[in-house]
Structures are given as structure tokens and as C-alpha cells.
Amino acid sequence: MSFQLNKAQQMALHDPLLSLTERERKHLQHSWAEPFSKKIFPYITEDRFSVLYSANPASRPNNPVNIYFGLLILREIFNQSDEEALNSLLFDIRYQYALHTTSFAEQPVSKNSLTNFRAAVYRYNQKHGIDLIQQEIEAQAKGFSKLLKIDGKTIRMDSLMVSSSCRKLSRLEIIYSTVSRFIKAIDKNTLPERFQAYLEENHYNDTIYRSRDEDLNGKIKKVLKDGLRLCHLYRKNKKIKQSEEFKLLSRMLKEQQGKSAKKIAPHSLQNPTDPDATYRKKGKKKHIGYTANLIEKFDDKNQMIEGYDLQKNTYSDQKFAEDTIKRLAEGTTTLVDGAYYSEEIAKKAEAKGIKMVPTNLVGGGKNSNADQFEIDEKEHLVIKCPSGHKPIHSTFKKGSYRAHFDKKHCSHCPLRKDCSAIKQKKSYLFRISEKTLHRCQLITKMGTSQYQELARKRAGIEGIPSALRRRYKIDHLPVRGVIRVKVYLGFKISAINCKRLIKGLANRHNLELSTLLCDHLLSLFSFQRTYQVKFAA
């Protein structure tokens, strides 16, 4: 199938729009379909997806990519299934108007079109490591930001856990399911007699459920032993060795063999039906699945999600912060919570001219008066204490400052109660690491009203994870695996952005009308006042 741009967007003589009454046309133009048709659909970049199709122009041309992409956005906006979205396109003129298909004799989407399009994107990502959906949605967000005049000088970030749709398994279930899947995938004629029992209908229930607690460790050892024998038996078979089932079996044995339950790593296999899902405990909640990161640019009136990512849930917020710093422009202010922040990350950001503003710090925000000591960080010397006394001597070694102060100054100092200097035999010792000093300085800075006013602006992004869960059902997706889940996440992000654009344009239009009306009224009143003054004279 060859790639072809969608050029058939002109109205035909038989276009159903021409048969609408004035009232129907007015309602259509005041619906969501109008801004989607004029401000969203025309800016979908079809060329980006040409790599999914054949370069041979003699082959059958593709159906319009921008219609697939636009319909997938509408599917998320209205929380529909593929079938419901297709039916809406077939019978709802608003969908056809939004996607410029009113003049088509047949709507160019069939039962499996959306599934096949997503599958093509998955395969391309697996082969080349390029997410075409993410590229398009992030480019789309930049265009929307320009339309709403969001400068993007200030951004905020937040992350959320995304649950896998796979079932939570016990350790025995993980081991058994992996071994059983491998056995069912190979040729039954080559399977040794001792493993034939795994093919029996009741073998799973007999192994997993019909057992006492004291039998559990024995069963785990037995199934692991069976898995190890299978691995040794088929490891020289090149075809089987390349299969997904053999790779999962090898991975499971490496992660589970010879280890107690407490020593199993969080990144270990949680369910063979979703190899990408990992385990993480965040706060008091346990999660199996992935973690998503959101980057939002905003101003006082509008917001736009300009970037996103999805990884296994063992991926930390600090890694997301490092990834984000690489893509941000100089002069950007980034509002984050404490999980994203570290001194090393702040230094990387500063080197690029990016300002990191944490709203809190991991481990709490308790402070001493250490930052009130005057310290020359270039010369690495403690100059004087908060009371103005110079140290007897000062050193800097292995990233820490050490300064000794005279007892006669410290013993009766009015600041002694809050001072971090430690009483010793001959002097008072002030000791602080460079990292702790910078933390104290930051905590003091975080207490200022100017800093708090800026930090409060981060709260606006915290509603997005809730919306993704409640409205967009991000924890109940029909697919598994990072690549597939990320595609669904991308269209949900695009749906949020499109709704924000439509709302933002409507608000701006209303504001412009209000301004025009106000100016008109002012001109009338101004004329009346001038006339009255002349008449009085």
C-alpha cells in the first residue's frame, strides 16, 4: 500500500452540507465540529506517517491518515470504543464536518482501520525506536500554544502511575504461568513425557489452588526445576530460542531461581502476559504497570500539555527530570515537586540556563541556621558566623566545610540555641557538607513569599492525573506493553489539548466581543458627555 496525501477536501455538488437548513447550519457552526474542522484537523501532518507505507507508487493508495488520526482523537474526547467512533463517523454529520468527509461517497474507515493503523505504528516503533504518535501530538501542542499565545517560558511537571490490565499474580503463579506458556508454544511431539501434565485441563488448579501453605515452597522449587530443565533442553534450538516464550522463561529463571521472596527485584516479571509491567510501591500504595510523565506549559488563562512520556514504573521522577532538561530551551522556569529535584539535576538545569523550582523537598524541609554562616563558595572558606565572629581556622575537604570558633564567642552567644556548631573540648566546630549547605539555602529561599507565589502555580497540573483516571480510564486500557499503552496515552493527551484549544478560542472570541461592545458603549457615552458640555456652554 503506497502513501498518498488526502487532497479530497473540497465540497462536492452533492455535499449534504448544502441541503442543511439555515437553522441546522447555524447549530453546526456553533458546535465543537467548527473549531475542530478549522483549527485542528488541517494541522495534522500526514507526511510524518508516510514511513508506514510502501514507496512503490504503483501499489494501492492508503486511506487518508489524517482522518484516522482525527477520528482517534474524537474517540478519546467522547470516550468511545472503535466501533462507536466508526458509527459516529458514518451517521453523525458533525464528525464528517470535523474530518472534512461530508463529500465522500463512502466514509474511508472500516471496522479494522483504526486497529491496523495503531498496529502499524507499534511495529514501526519496535523496529526503529521512533514514536510517530508522540511526535505528532507534541508538534500539535506547540501549534495550539501559538494559537492561544502561551509563551512557554514557565512549565510544570507531574507524574502518575498507570496500572497494567494484567492480573496480579502470586510468585508461584508467575513461575507456573511462564513455564506453562512455553510448553504450550512448542511442538507437542517433541515434548518429553514428564511435562505432558502441564497440558491437562485441571493441572493449573491442582498446582495453584489445591495446595496447603506448607506445600508452597516445595511447589515453587518443583516448577522452577521443570523450567530449568526445559531451558537446557531447548536452548540449542535456534527457532525456539528466538521465541518470546523462551525469552520470558529465561528471564523468569534468572530473576526467581535461588532467591527468597524478599530478594525478588521490582523490575522482575510480574505477569508473562505483560513483560513490560514492573512493581513499585509509592507511598502506601502498591502498583504494577508503568509510570507516565506530563509536561504542561501555561499562562494565566490557558494551559497545554506540550510533552509526555511513558516508562516502566521503576523509572524515577529524577530520570524524567533529566530527560526533560535535555529538551527544554534556555530561560525556561520548571515547577516540580520534590521527587523530581536533586542538587545534581539543578546543576545540569542551571548549565542550560533552566531554573528548577521545587515546591517541596524529599525528606522534609527542616532547616538550621547553617545558611546564615557567611561562606565563600569559590574559595571554599567559612568567613564568619551569624553573629559576625571569624573562625580560628577553616578547611574544606571531601566536599565538606569545617570551621572552628573560639569558645569565648560561642558559649554565651544569644544565637547559641539555634546554632549548628558543636561544642568540643577546645572550641566549637561548625561542619556542613556542600550539598547540605545548598539544601539549607534552598529551604530558606522556599520560605519567601515570592518563591511561594511561584511554587503555588504548580498545583494546576495535579488535576490531569485525576482526569486521566476518571474521564479517560487510563488504568483500564484494552492493551498491554509500554509501546501500546503509550499510543493510547498519547491520544488521551491530545483529546485534553484539543478540548482546551476549543475552550480557549471560544473564551477569546467572547472576550473580543465584550471588548468591542465595551468600546462601542464608551464611544457613545463619550459622545453624549461632549455634547452635554457644549450645550451647557
Which residue ranges define each predicted feature?
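Anion-binding and metal-coordination hotspots
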Residues: 84, 103, 107, 115-537
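Secondary-structure junction/capping motif
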Residues: 22-35, 64, 158, 274, ...
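Trp/Phe/Arg-rich N-terminal binding region typifying the photolyase-homology
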Residues: 36, 52-67, 74-133, 144, ...
